[in-house]
Amino acid sequence: AGRAHFRVCTVVAEAVAKLVADIHRYPDPRAHDLRAAVAAHWGITPGELAFGNGSNELIDLISRVFAGGDDHVVFGDPSFLCYRIACVAGAVPFTDVPLLNGLAWDVPAMLAAVTPRTRILFLSNPNNPTGAYVGGEALRHLLTSLPHEVMPVLDEAYAEFVTAPDFV
């Protein structure tokens, strides 16, 4: 009891042994190898990438760097709770735009919520927790309608689950 009936695959055992030998080391805080690989995959420079310990950390970092004081942030409601948490933690005023009946995004209302003080618009696409998404045409309209002072943050954590042809 308590033991598997099958032996561990040799390749797996060797990989685990190699990793365990370095377990006492801190990871590269700048993620140089990962940064280079992702940049090469997407055809961008490594300096265009930021990595963190999950989206919560990155959302908090974005909020702290790009919004503060009398600035303003826009996001949907309901949507990923970390947008609200980051704003409250940083004492940044925000507008949470209600989703439409059926929990669809209200792109016109999102744009209407933007003020001269707005610096960030968070869009969880597809939305967490509802799964609603903004299709390609509506997303292009949203992004091209935002003032240049507003940074759109597209949180696409669940994009791989969307199979709709109009999702970009």
Task: State where each predicted segment sits.
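Active-site pre-lysine segment of PLP-dependent enzymes
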Residues: 88, 105-117, 129-168
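Short, flexible loop segments at the rims of nucleotide/cofactor-binding pockets, characterized by
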Residues: 27, 50-51, 97-102, 129-132
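Glycine-rich, phosphate-binding/catalytic loops in enzymes
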Residues: 14-17, 68-69, 91-93, 137-141, ...
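Short glycine-rich anion-binding loops that position phosphate/pyrophosphate groups of nucleotides
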Residues: 2-5, 55-56, 80, 125-129, ...
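Glycine/Thr-rich phosphate-binding loops of Rossmann-like dinucleotide-binding domains
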Residues: 7, 59-62, 83-84, 130-131, ...
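Short acidic capping loops at alpha-helix termini that bridge into adjacent secondary structure
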Residues: 45-49, 70-72, 117, 149, ...
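PLP-dependent aminotransferase-like
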Residues: 65-123
